[in-house]
Amino acid sequence: MNLEVGTINSTLCIGFKGKNNASSILAKNISEDSCLLTNSFSGLQRDIEALNFYYDCVVLFGIDKSLKDAVRIEKAAEKETKEFSVLNLEKLSAQLAALGISNYLSENPTQYLCNDAYWHLLRKFNRKVVLIHIPSIRNISENFINRLSIAFR
């Protein structure tokens, strides 16, 4: 999946730790070089600070229990300031739709771990980051995880 900010040479996929966390399953399915964040505010900040490789693009997967076989692409994170991704998220949305993956764009970030991680990642990686909320393990089919994995390889 080309997220376009020039030529993408290396993409880091990030999920959250947890045995039954769909974001960790998806991140690992996409890339062996994936990273899993700790499920606490202080832990995820330490994890993000420890990332010292340069990536052209970062894709963060988070969970939204209200989603079912659809994803929500977050345009922004809000903490002390509202930070926006510079990636072409409209194009990403169209590419996912063309692959039969239901999705929608949002500018209203949640105020939980995913938003916090997204905000820190946007600042660390020059806003070349996207947060994609996916369904929880209870609301996501294996087929849907496989289609998402293929889309982001």
Predicted segments with their positions:
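Glycine-rich phosphate/pyrophosphate-binding loop and the adjoining helix
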Residues: 135-153
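Conserved beta-loop-beta element that borders a ligand/cofactor-binding pocket
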Residues: 126-136
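N-terminal catalytic or cofactor-binding beta/alpha core of small enzyme domains
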Residues: 1-113, 119-127, 147, 151-153
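Short, well-ordered, mixed-charge alpha-helical segments that flank or form enzyme active sites
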Residues: 111-116, 138-142
